[in-house]
């Protein structure tokens, strides 16, 4: 079934870039890119329209966050409806920086995911453990709790791509070994099988994030339960094309 799950590579630009930098990214995103890989880039919200208008049409564009309602007195927030109005179809939610820098709890993230799906967006919910949680053998406890919070608000699993990102590996240069990453992905898939359905477990893409690079992507892509990547800093550089083509 792994071969039936389309390989997925997302780029999370975080709070980086300006129009000139985006133009540079667009120039190398013309590829060639593996046609069997779905590609989405997550850009700062002020550049959603610019990126969508200039990025090749075969590449999706995602917001990096949104709120849980369509409109209202929520200064500084954007809604799924606004993201769609900019011509974009995707949103990244629950990234570890939203959880750990901005203090977003599991329940809020779940509500955001639910509203985004209701509004018609496709969603990349992020989960993952911190270093102290891994070192105290709590990885499964943490990621399963994060998944349990998400499930009640997921109305359409076909529009969900789960991103497992161990927090200790994000931007640190440390990467989970292919064996470590595959182990967590396999356990997450079994959790879906046990707590949602076998069909959802087999069809849902679970991607890996955490210092993915041109140097390690091919080994990570060979594993049975890693269905792609969510890439941070490397998505701003031409190496991103190598990562997209990891299974080429």
Curated annotation (Swiss-Prot):
The positions annotated for binding substrate are 12, 14
Q: What is the effect of changing residue 180 to A?
A: Subtle increased IgE-binding activity compared to wild-type
Keyword Transmembrane on this protein? no
Instruction: Name the EC number(s).
Output: 5.3.1.1, 4.2.3.3
| Primary localization class, coarse | cytoplasm
Q: Which Pfam families match?
A: TIM (PF00121)
Q: Does the keyword Isomerase apply?
A: yes
Reactions it catalyzes: D-glyceraldehyde 3-phosphate = dihydroxyacetone phosphate; dihydroxyacetone phosphate = methylglyoxal + phosphate
Q: Which GO molecular function terms does the record list? A: IgE binding; methylglyoxal synthase activity; protein homodimerization activity; triose-phosphate isomerase activity
Which InterPro entries does this chain map to?
Answer: Aldolase_TIM, TIM_sf, TrioseP_Isoase_bac/euk, Triosephosphate_isomerase, Triosephosphate_isomerase_AS
Q: Which UniProt keywords apply?
A: Allergen, Cytoplasm, Gluconeogenesis, Glycolysis, IgE-binding protein, Isomerase, Lyase
| Location relative to the cell | Cytoplasm
Domain of life, per the record?
Answer: Eukaryota
Q: What does this protein do?
A: Triosephosphate isomerase is an extremely efficient metabolic enzyme that catalyzes the interconversion between dihydroxyacetone phosphate (DHAP) and D-glyceraldehyde-3-phosphate (G3P) in glycolysis and gluconeogenesis.
Q: How does it associate, per the subunit comment?
A: Homodimer.
Similarity annotation: Belongs to the triosephosphate isomerase family.
Q: What is this protein called?
A: Triosephosphate isomerase
Species in which this protein is naturally found: Scylla paramamosain
């Amino acid at each position: 079934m792994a071969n039936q799950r389309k390989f997925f590579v997302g780029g999370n630009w975080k709070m980086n870039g300006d129009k000139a930098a985006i133009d540079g990214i667009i120039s190398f995103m013309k590829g060639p890119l593996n046609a069997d890989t779905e590609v989405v880039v997550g850009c700062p919200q002020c550049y959603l329209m610019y990126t969508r208008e200039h990025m090749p049409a075969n590449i999706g564009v995602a917001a990096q966050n949104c709120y849980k309602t369509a409109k209202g007195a929520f200064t500084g927030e954007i809604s799924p409806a606004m993201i769609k109005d900019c011509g974009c179809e995707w949103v990244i939610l629950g990234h570890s920086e939203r959880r750990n820098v901005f203090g977003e709890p599991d329940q809020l993230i779940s509500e955001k995911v639910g509203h985004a799906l209701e509004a018609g967006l496709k969603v990349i919910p992020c989960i993952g453990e911190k270093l102290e949680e891994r070192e105290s053998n709590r990885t499964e406890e943490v990621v399963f709790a994060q998944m349990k919070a998400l499930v009640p608000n997921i109305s359409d699993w076909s529009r969900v791509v789960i991103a497992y990102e161990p927090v200790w590996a994000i931007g640190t240069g440390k990467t989970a070994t292919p064996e470590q990453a595959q182990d967590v992905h396999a356990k997450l898939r079994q959790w879906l099988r046990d707590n949602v359905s076998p069909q959802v477990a087999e069809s849902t893409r679970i991607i890996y994030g955490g210092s993915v690079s041109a140097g390690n992507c091919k080994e990570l892509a060979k594993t049975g339960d890693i269905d792609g990547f969510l890439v941070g800093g490397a998505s701003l550089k031409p190496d991103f094309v190598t990562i997209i083509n990891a299974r080429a």
